[in-house]
């Protein structure tokens, strides 16, 4: 497994998006993982509709702007037979009624894989599969006001996960400062152009390996 990987440099990752005042991080994490897998399969990077997931995946257990899980989103896409493009079904940051149109579907999946809850397993998946959906504890002001460097907060929990994000790579600075490259959905103004480097191999810091998964296409 390589010592560093960055899928943003290989065309797998769309520009940073902004979820706004809606608890839809799970939808952004899910589209991010599927955008990467569709690019891997087709060589085309197409931005996918979070709004489609917000509006339509309640039967799978999601709650729109009140939260959800990436695996439920992948399950919806499988059962629905597709997911519309961002362009055809733009983001509104609010709960609206399902307006899925199969003719605008830009992706589908056959299910999902849950990665074993270890950073080594996550590292292997990121290296071999592509961007991976993960959930983290992002409930600290240190995270909300993050700007640069490797994020580490001793109060971060590996169990109380409240935010879905996308691991797009990993790397290291110096001898032992290892990090995950994480795409957030709080717009490009947040953090480092919308990204955060999160401490890696520090006892599953912030729970990054606790609920990691990706869709199969």
Curated annotation (Swiss-Prot):
Highest taxon of source: Eukaryota
Spans through the membrane: none
Record EC number: 3.4.22.15
Gene3D superfamilies tied to this protein: Cysteine proteinases
Binding site for Zn(2+) 6: 160
Family note: Belongs to the peptidase C1 family.
Subunit structure: Dimer of a heavy and a light chain linked by disulfide bonds. Interacts with Long isoform of CD74/Ii chain; the interaction stabilizes the conformation of mature CTSL.
Annotated protein name in UniProt: Procathepsin L
